[in-house]
Amino acid sequence: MEKQLTEYQQKVKQKFIDDRGPWKWSAMWDTILELDPAVVESYATYSSVPDKRGYLEMRMRKFIYIAIDSITGSLNTSGLKGHMKHALQLGVSTREILEVLEITSMIGSTTYELGVPELMDALQQRGISVAAAELNEHQKALKADYIQKHGGYWTNEKENILRLDPEYFESFTAFEETPWKSGVLTPKEKELVYIAVHAAPVSLNKKALRYHINCALDSGATANEIVEVFELVSTLGIHSITIGVPILKEALTELELC
């Protein structure tokens, strides 16, 4: 038997729908509303701030939500499907969504870019210097091509990856270029998605974040737009509640405690 909402719960539910849109409400939120209406109310207020300001177009906000809900480590299939459906209803194309997913998949490079420097330090402490050897002609060509395509950008991390495994460097660089070949999203839109991916708590990468912030600014993004990306990404924390509370309700039901 469905429980009747209290006056406060009804008020909170309507506020949530008014702030976030009717498409956002689901049975999951009914469960959270039942157990803790106060957190639903406070979340509706804080998470709707970017929507009310609207520095980013709605389609761009959908790109950000799709990206952060599809990141390995914070994958939220329920939220991802909801944002995809809403994006499609808004007129976003399948190709645009695919490109957002392709950009998000690049997060795998963080393991290599953060791990290789640690390996290099460990090797150096043992008297092994990978950097001492000259790059061969193929490695020099790969480096020159990368620098040319990325406006002069190069880091010690990429240098070390190139030295340790040029085949991997070449293949992953080609993989990274995939979203830039289709041209569906603008350079600015791509960079804002990259910022979201590298600013997510589970995949935070300060160097990559700084690089893509500069690229976004160069592509015409404003400070307000970038701040709004951060605000959207910060809502990732709610997954602890949206995923955890329904499981808590199941446990309570199975133990006949509610």
Where does each model-flagged region fall?
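Acidic, glycine/proline-rich low-complexity segments that act as flexible tails and inter-domain linkers
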Residues: 1-60, 89, 112-189, 214, ...
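Alpha-helix N-cap/helix-initiation sites
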Residues: 54-61, 77, 94, 183-187, ...
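Amphipathic, charged-and-aliphatic alpha-helical interface segments
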Residues: 61-76, 190-205
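Short amphipathic alpha-helical segments at helix boundaries and their inter-helical linkers
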Residues: 72-83, 104-119, 201-212, 233-249
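A cross-kingdom feature marking solvent-exposed beta-strand/loop segments within repeated
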Residues: 81-96, 213, 217-219
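Membrane-interface alpha-helices at helix entry/exit sites of multi-pass transporters
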Residues: 96-101, 225-229
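Alpha-helical transmembrane segments and their immediate juxtamembrane flanks
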Residues: 133-136, 227, 231-233, 238
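Extended, charge-rich C-terminal regions with high alpha-helical propensity
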Residues: 172-174, 193, 201-202, 206-207, ...
